[in-house]
């Protein structure tokens, strides 16, 4: 069976979301939201805040290995911070060359680096030299900034710079998250480099996963928004749940939501829990129409305890409806 990896998603796949989704099961690994590196050495408390998995040996509560992702554009500062991160991230260091966010790109980070393959090579080689050999250094990239003209050059620069593997998101920065994903370009990249390539982009269903593998030629797939829209997608791919979502699974989804909110409330460093739950419901609406109804029910609520009460009431009501008549 190929590997299934949970993608880093800034503002979405935080520590608690990683905990909940990997607890559902099916993932072989996950990557943190990016830790931004500028012109300083980050203190240890930054990693403790952003990636609490380090207190568990780099694993989520369910035992899924987590890799810390760094984002920046200065080779030396990235290397110094990677060396420090490697002391608490035994499963690897990932470098972000794919973030399309304007706030990141205007500082020359993320996907903007795909305009300069030589800088990509320098970053990866400098980081690789600074990190112990036992710690894998990997990279995540897109197909380019505005077009694919440098896609092969960028992938080659990363691989030759020392990246142990590449995750390729099959769109350019300018394409954002608009379909389609160009999985055929992943195949071209995989043919051009001598390191493993992981396919990423527009995998929402089991059928998407199968087509992605067939077109890209990659065994391993990283899933992002599809994992948030369907928490059971990895299990479906592995044949451990029904291939297609159904209304009968909605109580399980409510259980995931309740678990997520309870864990958010327990995290002192997390604020605005109500906004995060509403954000997740926005993704879930793609798979379950009931999510739209629940979103409407909590739309104006600001208190997380009230929202939890609505979720638990919905669960209780389903239980009453399914109970045999006495």
From Swiss-Prot:
This entry's Enzyme Commission designation comes to 1.3.1.-
Active site at 99 (proton donor)
Tell me which cofactor or cofactors this protein depends on: FMN
Q: Does the keyword Cell membrane apply?
A: no
User: Which Gene Ontology molecular function entries are recorded, alphabetically?
Assistant: flavin adenine dinucleotide binding; FMN binding; tRNA binding; tRNA-dihydrouridine16 synthase activity
InterPro entries noted in UniProt: Aldolase_TIM, DUS-like_FMN-bd, DUS_fam, DusC, DusC_C, tRNA_hU_synthase_CS
Interacts with tRNA, annotated site positions: 36, 96, 177, 276, 278, 283, 299
Cysteine disulfide links: none
Reactions the enzyme catalyzes: 5,6-dihydrouridine(16) in tRNA + NADP(+) = uridine(16) in tRNA + NADPH + H(+); 5,6-dihydrouridine(16) in tRNA + NAD(+) = uridine(16) in tRNA + NADH + H(+)
Give binding positions for FMN: 8-10, 69, 140, 200-202, 224-225
The enzyme's main class, written as a single word, is: oxidoreductase
| Pfam families on file | Dus (PF01207)
List keywords of the entry alphabetically.
Flavoprotein, FMN, NADP, Oxidoreductase, RNA-binding, tRNA processing, tRNA-binding
Family designation: Belongs to the Dus family. DusC subfamily.
Function recorded in the entry? Catalyzes the synthesis of 5,6-dihydrouridine (D), a modified base found in the D-loop of most tRNAs, via the reduction of the C5-C6 double bond in target uridines. Specifically modifies U16 in tRNAs.
Any idea what this protein is called? tRNA-dihydrouridine(16) synthase
Question: Which gene is this protein's source?
Answer: dusC
